[in-house]
Amino acid sequence: DWIIYNMNQKTDFNSNVVVVQPIDKGMVNMLNAQDDLYHVNLQGLDKGETINSLTMIDVISRALNPYTQNDEFMKLAEQPEMRFVISNTTEAGIAFDPACKLTDTPASSYPGKLTQLLYHRFKTFNGDKSKGLIIFPCELIFLNGHKLKEAIYQYIELWQLGDEFRAWFEEACGVYATLVDRIVPGFPRKDI
């Protein structure tokens, strides 16, 4: 969110973020209760200078719990302007769970949810390759993009989603290995 905020401030990126909590128990209700606004307090060194800045992040348009708002979650795939998926579901988040079904609302695993979303997008736009998504997993595991892609292929096979969808995913969607550029500590309760 902070990176999107800065891109909006410094370029004509002009984008927003929909937060989707990856597990049933999450904090989207708290985020929604504060109008999807929060602050980032940057402390440390920037170009050799000590910094301590507080910035209100205002790029979240809404936050969803797919376990109670699955229809709204799936409708994200119908937005033609949607381009990016950025995830950080912890190291355990990128895992294939063979118990997940295409008909689950939603699948319990993150790769399962993402496959459901991608398949719905594929069907919504009739396989239009210009509607593929750019996917940046930020989970702290080696070759996170490769592992996420591997799990999606497993769901394509398990759920028998077909060669056309597999080809669309391979050709229209980019899944990249990433490395986070900073560690964000938890809420500084003792300082607030």
Question: Which stretches of residues belong to each language-model region?
Answer:
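Substrate/ligand-engaging "lid" and interaction regions
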Residues: 2-192
